[in-house]
Amino acid sequence: MYFNNELSGLKDRFLKSLLAQKYPDRINFFLWELKFLDCFLHLQNFAFASECGMLDVSQKMLKNFKRMCATFRSIRPNAGSDNAFAYLKEVICKRLCATLLNTRPDACSDDGFAYWNEVIWKTKQEFRAKYSFPKTPLASNKVDDDDINIHSPKFVMEFIDAVVGNLNVLVKINDPCSLLFVPGPKEQIDQVSKELKLLRFFVCFVSNKCIEPQYGHTTFYIHALIEASHIAMVVWLHLPVYGNGNQDLAPSEVSRLLSDFISRNSNYIDVLKALKSTIPQAQNKHAAESGIVETPTHNLMVGLSDQMVNLQEMLCLLRDNLIHLPILDLEFHLQDMDSVILDAGLLIYSLYDIEGEKEDTVLDDMNRALGFDLPRNIEPIKVMVYLVMQKAFQCNLPRVHGLGYVDFLLKNLNDFQGRYSDSLAFLKNQLQVIQTEFESLQPFLKVVIEEPHNKLKTLNEDCATQIIRKAYEVEYVVDACINKVAPHWCLERWLLDIIEEITCIKAKIQEKNTVEDTMKTVITHTSSQLARTPRMNEEIVGFKDVIENLRNRLLNGTKGQDVISIHGMPGLGKTTLANRLYSDRSVVSHFDICAQCCVSQVYSYKELLLALLCDAVGDDSARRKHNENKLADKLRKTLLSRRYLILVDDVWDNSAWDDLRGCFPDANNRSRIILTTRHHEVAKYASVHSDPLHLRMFDEDESWKLLEKKVFGEKRCSSLLLKDVGLRIAKMCEQLPLSIVLVAGILSEMEKEVECWEQVANNLGTHIHNDSRAIVNQSYHVLPCHLKSCFLYFGAFLEDEVIDISRLIRLWISESFIKSSEGRRLEDIAEGYLENLIGRNLVMVTQRADSDGKVKACRLHDVLLDFCKERAAEENFLLWINRDQISTKAVYSHKQHAHLAFTEMDNLVEWSASCSLVGSVLFKNPDSYLYSPAFSISLILLNFKFLKVLDLERQVVIDFIPTELFYLRYLSASIEQNSIPSSISNLWNLETLILKGISAKTLLLPSTIWDMVKLRHLHIPKFSPENDEALLENSARLYDLETISTPYFSSVEHAELILRKTPNLRELICEVECLEYPPQYHVLNFPIRLEILKLYRSKAFKTIPFCISAPNLKYLKLSGFYLDSQYLSETADHLKHLEVLKLCDLEFGDHREWKVSNGMFPQLKILKLEYLSLMKWIVADDAFPNLEQLVLHGCQDLMEIPSCFMDILSLKYIEVDMSNKSVVKSAKNIEETQVEDNQNTNFKLVVIKKMMWKVDVGVNKGRLETFKRLAPLPGIKSVAFDFNKKKLTVTGDMDANEVQLVVSKLRKRGML
């Protein structure tokens, strides 16, 4: 309305005043009155307002305002203006609030509000007696064409909205002491409000149908305005006034209001009949407003309303699905849809014109009275309801699908029919037919994956997409049936149509002979698309001159700190080049400390500091509790007096550099910082001595070498003709490395034929103009359909985020992206998909496992990530909801099965009501802190009833587990409780459960967890299963469970029982209760398929109470135990296939000696020893025959590495860190023998300068400050204390003897 902004500002002024808390009810009452007055002032140009007295009311109240504000002489109407609106706004907003809340202008009273109350009351008494409903014929209420905006439908709807808003205030007030309280039932006011809303819908509907206003429509708008204004006046006059007694709204007035509405239904009917002759106008983005089909049943007779139940149900379904349905999806049905809606409106309003109805009115009598056949008229409505419901679901289905969705549906159909047999009984036959049809199509879907280069690839993928869409629809129909959100006739018809459509798809497949043979026999050969792409040496290609230039800057130049800034456009290889230098051995050996961080466009300052500190001094979980200032100070002190190399990657603006630069002190010791950025301004701003380096483009020779290496690996292109085409393609990439790599990914999947490469060259020729996105789009276009969804899913991750592969694969499986294949694990198939994307150069590997070369972590280039986000949004696949994005229900209310990524939980609350059919909710935030919303996040999540993936990354604390989401397959979050409810078993589809308790207490796992037979991955830090052995014995076995972390086993018997329940376990991380002195080692048989085992102690150093027996174990980590040679020898006898052994923080018995006999650990490839008390290590000549890597960290008591390592021909790498000089010397002797005598050119020795010594000094807390004096001494990096063990730990470059000398001096001085 005209006065809305002023009222809003006035309310803000009231709420900010000191009286807001004292008189909140007065403020609300005052604003309520002004809103009604505003309504009446807007009617001053209409004749009916003057005839019925509304205009007199507004003029009277305006005079009162003027008199109340008479003391403010400075307030005058603008010159030449007698506009009541302008004067009212000026007076009210500037002066009246002060008058009302403080003093009366013409009296000494201290209560201006009491005076205002009295004025209103007298005015209402004066006008109540003489007010009457306007009887003027509608025709006489015409206004001139010049005033068309005043009575436009927009004006009418805004007026109705204002009146409805004031009525809703009365309905909500239940406090008898409130000035706005209306005693007695509120049904009368509520019914008036509903009538007005219905009228408003009708006005909107008419306006949508008629772009050009006609005389009849304008008359109708005036009629609607008269009705609404009459309601406003009656309600205002009869409102109870504080201090004058509560007076209810007169029942007679309410009855008259409703009867007035009903008596004028003939006007609605006339307008609807006129609209039937018009052509539907599609001027709006969405289908027409359907509010007119909301049946106003309060005046329908009981007998009649009972007969209209079915009609009302259909109309509600029509309304609910039409409101936000994009009109483009119904463009061929607009005429039919308009006809149905108009007929429905005529049917409803005609019911009120039947006079003399009796309560025993029957359907036949009603049909005769109306002049038409009700059942026949309802049938078109049923057809339209079904069409609209179907379209509302189909129109925004994602256009990219996971081919594993049919597998998920087929499993669930069996479960649904077993769990909900009663609800699904009437659909049993149809569901059985559908199940059979989908099973018959499984071989075809397998062909689509295994033969992506089939000549009918496009047709195959189109058919596969249609099949998946039908699977989505079946799932929705089944759920709608179970939850009774749609009538049986509609769902039954829908399933019959799905069966018919599947039959058509099969016919199309057979007709084109795409699977003529495979529909009868199953293809058994392994696809090249599932095979792993051979890994090649990831050595950088090109930029040799640039590398040499930058290496010289890092090692030479000024003695002061210097920043080496590298800038250039996306895709040039700035990050690759910087990482190449950062990992260069000749560079790294020059610096004491090396650390790196990636900033990105959106970053967390705290996370950057933590990343740098982790590289500089090691990881420390307690450090996360510190604030940013403390972390920054810690980093600065760590780097002070040390020569450091820092890599700061992907800086977007100067402020990011300002945040970090203070942490890098300049000690004039040739410290260096490498900085990469896209922007020259940032590079120049950060520079100190060296000029920024603008990274050049590739030259033609470098372009071809990179393309050749990416396509052929270590081989060369032998065909001159092929090379000619390749050179042309490389040149077309315009010397941009990213473009070359992406095109190489396309070529590597093609036959090495000139014709194929020519086709790529021709396609690229029309797209490439310094536009990497065009090449990315080409790479995406040639992806097999089963890889497209996997690739676009990367758009759900943050910029520069390092993605854990285990987590990614679990998400892919939960999203049904992975198609099952008989005899193969889904995880193995998913790894093949990933390697395929890596082979196409769409995904960058950041970490591989040392033992088997499998990818452990990856990331996406910024250009590729942006493409994934944009393309995923276009395909209705993934939508990012950012902090400043406004919820638009009209656009996103039906994003069926899409994935939503949120950066703030508040966004989730705003969007939850309009995203009930979303399949995935992913929370992404660069900060790692726990987020505890003030609202019930779990209640919000219940709105997402089709949710299959809920990944809150254990960052968001949920108040309870939403166990009603039975489609859920992946759940990751933090919880407040110390126990998990037994209702967790209601999530019977759950495959991955990742929970973290916010307290340090052990989480209690209910026994019902053993009912979750689909569970594959269970990860809960420090949980304890209910120790009810009888209950566990009788529970089911979890045959699908493959990974568990981190249960607490209180006894060997407890562990045995759990292991029997998980026969197919592959990875186990657990804590065990240890024994002081076990009488003998009990052999604990772990599941035969177990490959990874990590054991941690639960308390202080004690012996493991069992000997490990796991015939196929490949990875073993033991941490925190008391061990001896006997235990390790007995364990080795049961671990013949062990490839990786990590012993961490162990105390050794037997005089701190470890003897390794011949034949022990025959398959071991990696041996890592960290912080052991080991002094003497004796290894037989034939032990560790296949060892490749030996890593020693913090083994400061070890005297030397056994000489037998010189003769292990498979040895490739030794790393020594924080150890004594004797260990370093023995490692160098081994290196010399391996390289010179054994000619092992692949051998590499890495000695890290940091050294650690532990000295027993009898430390007590009172001397803590004394020891801190050690830290600033030259050569000492840090000092740490362990009061329990009475040990001092000094980290630095000093010799151990020098440390002992310092300690001796401190003792002599009485400081120890």
From Swiss-Prot:
Q: What is its main location?
A: cytoplasm
GO cellular component labels? cytoplasm; membrane
Gene Ontology MF terms in the entry = ADP binding; ATP binding; metal ion binding
Where does the record say this protein resides?
A: Cytoplasm; Membrane
Q: Which residues form the NB-ARC domain?
A: 521-823
Q: According to the record, where are the LRR repeats? A: 944-968, 990-1012, 1087-1111, 1115-1134, 1135-1158, 1161-1183, 1184-1208, 1273-1296
Question: Sorted alphabetically, which keywords does the UniProt record give?
Answer: ATP-binding, Coiled coil, Cytoplasm, Hypersensitive response, Leucine-rich repeat, Membrane, Nucleotide-binding, Plant defense, Repeat
Q: How does it sit in the membrane?
A: Peripheral membrane protein
Coiled-coil annotated residue ranges, if any: 419-442, 535-556
Alphabetical list of SUPFAM superfamilies matching this protein: L domain-like (SSF52058), P-loop containing nucleoside triphosphate hydrolases (SSF52540)
Q: Which Gene3D superfamilies match?
A: 3.30.70.100, Helical domain of apoptotic protease-activating factors, P-loop containing nucleotide triphosphate hydrolases, Ribonuclease Inhibitor, Winged helix-like DNA-binding domain superfamily/Winged helix DNA-binding domain
Q: Which Pfam families does its entry note? A: LRR_14, NB-ARC, NB-LRR, WH_DRP
What GO terms in the biological process aspect are recorded for it?
plant-type hypersensitive response
The HMA domain covers which part of the protein?
1248-1312
Q: Where does ATP bind?
A: G568, M569, P570, G571, L572, G573, K574, T575
The similarity comment for this entry is:
Belongs to the disease resistance NB-LRR family.
Functional summary from the UniProt entry: Confers resistance to late blight (Phytophthora infestans) races carrying the avirulence gene Avr1. Resistance proteins guard the plant against pathogens that contain an appropriate avirulence protein via an indirect interaction with this avirulence protein. That triggers a defense system including the hypersensitive response, which restricts the pathogen growth.
Which miscellaneous remark does the UniProt record hold?
This protein is encoded by the haplotype B genome of the allohexaploid Solanum demissum.
PANTHER family named in the record: AAA+ ATPASE DOMAIN-CONTAINING PROTEIN (PTHR23155:SF1152), DISEASE RESISTANCE PROTEIN RP (PTHR23155)
State the protein's name: Putative late blight resistance protein homolog R1B-17
- In its UniProt entry, the species of origin is given as Solanum demissum (Wild potato)
